[in-house]
Amino acid sequence: IALDAHGLAHVRAGSALDAFRAQGWNAARDRLWQIDLWRKRGLGRLAEDFGPGYLAQDRAARLLLYRGEMGPEWAAYAPDAEAICEAFTQGINAYVAGIEAGDLPLPREFELMGTRPARWAAEDVVRIRSHALVKNAVSELVRARLLREAGPEADALRQPLEPPVARPAPEAAPDLPLEAVDALRLGTAGVAFPPERLAAALE
């Protein structure tokens, strides 16, 4: 892995899988706090590191988490998808191992929060990607209800489509209870660290 004058990484590898290992290592070097937080948020494991103030978000995240069997899931992807994810996460884990051995520095964010980066499994990549598939779920529910109740003109005022597309009103927009919408919103939210949340205790 060579860095150019702009700090951009250029990977040279003897095989495609080695390139993915190098990319995992480089991603960990550049963004370990970010990807570690993505993993913990996606798997519903924030409270393990940050305390009971994150239990509600963990519960909501686990509602959206893919929990199916991995064999059929891998079989639905390209033939080399599992090997690619294995190689990529091996690269991440190699960087984490370097930190654990004292050979690489622990990113400052972990020091400030008193946490440590976790090891990845290949299936983590698949399980947390389900969150990306529902990221706009709340917006889609709002759009469907607005189309049904007030028509496309009202929805265009809320958020115009780019490019403009005529959207017929759905015959039956989901009439979810507010608790379900709140869970969707919380389960797809980013992670914030207000002091009162970090100081929360179990009731």
Which residues fall in each region the model found?
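Substrate-recognition/specificity elements adjacent to catalytic centers across diverse enzyme folds
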Residues: 2-203
